[in-house]
Amino acid sequence: MGLGGPLSSATSFASKTLEGAMSDSMAESAVAQAAKMKIDTQNSILDGKMDSATKEINSGHNAAKAIQF
């Protein structure tokens, strides 16, 4: 038998398996975080547009109220 034999092979296999799982997990997490950042940015832009539209509508209403006949 070689140095360590089956135990050494099992340990090496387990270590490589865990390294692969951690690598996959980190990659999936990075992809999910990038997608969330993109969605958060889009939502922030849309919120700003909605706020501007609301201010414009309110300004129009206030101007209409100020007109006296």
From Swiss-Prot:
The keyword Secreted applies. It is found in: Secreted; Fimbrium. Transmembrane segments: none annotated. The keyword NADP does not apply. GO terms for cellular component: extracellular region; pilus. Signal peptide: none annotated. Disulfide bonds: none annotated. Keywords: Fimbrium, Secreted, Virulence. It comes from the Bacteria. Belongs to the HrpA type 2 family. Major structure protein of the hrp pilus, which is a component of the type III secretion system (T3SS, Hrp secretion system) required for effector protein delivery, parasitism, and pathogenicity. The hrp pilus functions as a conduit for protein delivery into the host cell. This is Hrp pili protein HrpA.
